[in-house]
């Protein structure tokens, strides 16, 4: 159990100082290849993989500690979700093909299963994950956000409200 905990804590480490590290940043953005904003690239893969382990190991002797689950939730709900509106992901690099065959115009579809897993695995924030999931699967005038969010480590800003959203890098 200790080895599993240590590994998963390492995978979801949060960079708390101003040194460059490839990790989730204090502002809930994700760095890779130095100081490069990859929340919807490598960060998406990290969210997919970590949500799988959090989900699959829940209610076992190897279940992931609440601190890691909270960090995972913060990364999505307090960071990445500000980059998603409908099936559009802002700053998606397009190095993988879009999922036109299943009706999505961008890569946001990749978040559907991980969000479903987190709804089950993190019931205290299930409603927040559900809003992000609804935003992807059934886009409406709102993406569940209302206000401004600035990822100061990555220089990325979002302003969202019903019927309107703008992101700047």
Language model segments and positions:
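Extracellular polysaccharide-recognition and catalytic grooves
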Residues: 1-169
């Amino acid at each position: 159990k200790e080895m599993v905990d240590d590994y998963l804590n390492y995978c979801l480490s949060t960079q708390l100082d101003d040194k460059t590290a490839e990790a989730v940043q204090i502002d809930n953005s994700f760095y890779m290849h130095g100081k490069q904003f990859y929340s919807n690239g490598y960060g998406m893969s990290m969210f997919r993989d970590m949500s799988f382990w959090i989900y699959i190991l829940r209610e076992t002797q190897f279940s992931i500690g609440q601190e890691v689950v909270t960090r995972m939730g913060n990364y999505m709900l307090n960071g990445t979700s500000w980059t998603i509106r409908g099936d559009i992901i802002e700053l998606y690099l397009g190095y993988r093909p879009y999922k036109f065959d299943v009706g999505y115009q961008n890569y946001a579809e990749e978040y559907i299963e991980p969000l479903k897993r987190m709804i089950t695995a993190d019931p205290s924030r299930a409603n927040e994950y559900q809003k992000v999931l609804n935003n992807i699967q059934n886009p409406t005038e709102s993406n569940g956000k209302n206000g401004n969010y600035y990822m100061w480590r990555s220089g990325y800003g979002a302003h969202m409200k019903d019927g309107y959203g703008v992101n700047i890098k």
